């Protein structure tokens, strides 16, 4: 019995390592295809956005999470459910703005950066920028326009990885006239 449980753990670890290495290969290829880090950062964000737009359906179906009533509740669901479900980590939520429209997600351990060192000639590369795009894309599909950006990164010598989230506005559904 313990042998089967051990296999499941090994399989999960292999899957996460394969994901990490595959992501690294993707970023490496983007660095070869684009002339500067800023263009790579934009592509990672764009790819993440497209993933987030599709991932939200899977998330809502698998998590049974209802509609969030405010940005604080949204932050809790992102940190405690979504990150745990897809990356196996639970970031902490800190640095709320007084207005309650901004917060930080602190990732003590970013699984995307396992086995990674940034070369000196890519100092402005935001290696995990895909995550910001995923957050923006997923939240846009539930009528929330947000800004997400990295403000600290362990790959750049910081102690933790920090994603700053800012609520911009609620997106209103624009239905054609006569439809509801």
From Swiss-Prot:
The consequence of residue 68 to S is:
Loss of palmitoylation
A Pfam match: TRAPP
Where does it reside? Golgi apparatus, cis-Golgi network; Endoplasmic reticulum
Gene Ontology CC entries for this record: cis-Golgi network membrane; cytoplasm; cytosol; endoplasmic reticulum; Golgi membrane; TRAPP complex; TRAPPII protein complex; TRAPPIII protein complex
Query: Where does the UniProt entry say this protein principally localizes?
Result: Golgi
Q: Quick check: keyword Lipoprotein in the entry?
A: yes
Residues linked to a lipid group, S-palmitoyl cysteine type: 68
* GO biological process terms held by the UniProt record: COPII vesicle coating; endoplasmic reticulum to Golgi vesicle-mediated transport; intra-Golgi vesicle-mediated transport; vesicle coating; vesicle tethering
Entry keyword rRNA-binding: no
Q: Which domain of life is it from?
A: Eukaryota
Keywords of the record: Endoplasmic reticulum, ER-Golgi transport, Golgi apparatus, Lipoprotein, Palmitate, Transport
Q: What is the recorded function of this protein according to its Swiss-Prot or TrEMBL entry?
A: May play a role in vesicular transport from endoplasmic reticulum to Golgi.
What the record says about family reads:
Belongs to the TRAPP small subunits family. BET3 subfamily.
**Subunit and partners:** Homodimer. Component of the multisubunit transport protein particle (TRAPP) complex, which includes at least TRAPPC2, TRAPPC2L, TRAPPC3, TRAPPC3L, TRAPPC4, TRAPPC5, TRAPPC8, TRAPPC9, TRAPPC10, TRAPPC11 and TRAPPC12. Heterodimer with TRAPPC6A. The heterodimer TRAPPC3-TRAPPC6A interacts with TRAPPC2L. Heterodimer with TRAPPC6b. The heterodimer TRAPPC6B-TRAPPC3 interacts with TRAPPC1 likely providing a core for TRAPP complex formation.
This one is known as: Trafficking protein particle complex subunit 3
Tell me what gene encodes this: TRAPPC3
């Amino acid at each position: 019995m313990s042998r089967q449980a051990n296999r499941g753990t090994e399989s999960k670890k292999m899957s996460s390592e394969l994901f990490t290495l595959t992501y690294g290969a993707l970023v490496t290829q983007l660095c070869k295809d684009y002339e500067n880090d800023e263009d790579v950062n934009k592509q990672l964000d764009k790819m993440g956005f497209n993933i987030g737009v599709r991932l939200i359906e899977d998330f809502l179906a698998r998590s049974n999470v209802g509609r969030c009533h405010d940005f604080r509740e949204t932050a809790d669901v992102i940190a405690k459910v979504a990150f745990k479900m897809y990356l196996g980590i639970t970031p902490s939520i800190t640095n709320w703005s007084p207005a309650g429209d901004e917060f930080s997600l602190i990732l003590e351990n970013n699984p995307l950066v396992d086995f990674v060192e940034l070369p000196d000639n890519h100092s402005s590369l935001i290696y995990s920028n895909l995550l910001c795009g995923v957050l923006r894309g997923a939240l846009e599909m539930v009528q929330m326009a947000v800004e997400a950006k990295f403000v600290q990164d362990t790959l750049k010598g910081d102690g933790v990885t920090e994603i700053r989230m800012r609520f911009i506005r609620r997106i209103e559904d624009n239905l054609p006239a006569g439809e509801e």
